[in-house]
Amino acid sequence: MYNNTLLFLTLAFCMAASSCFDANQVSSRPQESAAIVKTMQSSFYQLQANSLEGKPVSLDQFKGKKIIVLNVASKCGYTPQYADWERFFQSHKDQAVVLGFPSNNFMGQEPGSAEEIAEFCQKNYGVSFPMFEKVDVKGEGISPVYKWLTDPAQNGWNKQEPSWNFCKYLINEKGELTHFFASKVTPESPEFKEAFSK
């Protein structure tokens, strides 16, 4: 009984806290920023990240597809979004890919090892989209992928860091960052559907 109450209170707190952080649910690249893209210091496709199995993955293999980058966690109120994004991935494989980056940056909600994360995702949600090693998505130890996503000098316009677990970054078929979405946004949210259709 005590454990259930504690779990409920933790989830309630996390949802309340994340709703405070998610005041700006969507950020999109301003029209005039299109010219800035040409002077970006680096391309998303130049980046590399290690898979959940520890193998190097060059992100240029996703050229020509839209990319949705998620910072994920196993013990968050938004964790059920794994199912939403797996369904999205399965139905849009020809035109898009979802990349999951486990992170323990928010209230320690991803404490597991790579093996534990892989088992959790497969057992509970059947996750088949690419998953990567646990990384920092903010702060001094920020991973190169999230440094690119949050540094205007590299991506051309955006400085918005993840405000909680399950924030999303949308990258177009040319490797340009076009949108940031807060945790609450799912594949069925009107704002995501509109951005993805462009």
What annotation goes with each model-predicted range?
Residues F21-D22:
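Bacterial signal peptide processing site
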Residues M1-L7:
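Bacterial N-terminal signal peptides that target proteins for export
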Residues P144-K147, P152-K198:
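Thiol-/selenol-based redox modules, centered on thioredoxin-like
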Residues E115-W164:
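Short, internal strand/loop/helix patches
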Residues Q95-S113, S128-G139:
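Thiol-based oxidoreductase modules, predominantly thioredoxin-like and allied folds used
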Residues F8-A17:
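Bacterial N-terminal signal peptides
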Residues K65-I67, K75, T79-S103, Q122-Y125:
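Conserved helix-turn-beta segment immediately C-terminal to the redox Cys motif
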Residues V26-D60, S143-P144:
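N-terminal "domain-start" segment that seeds a small globular fold
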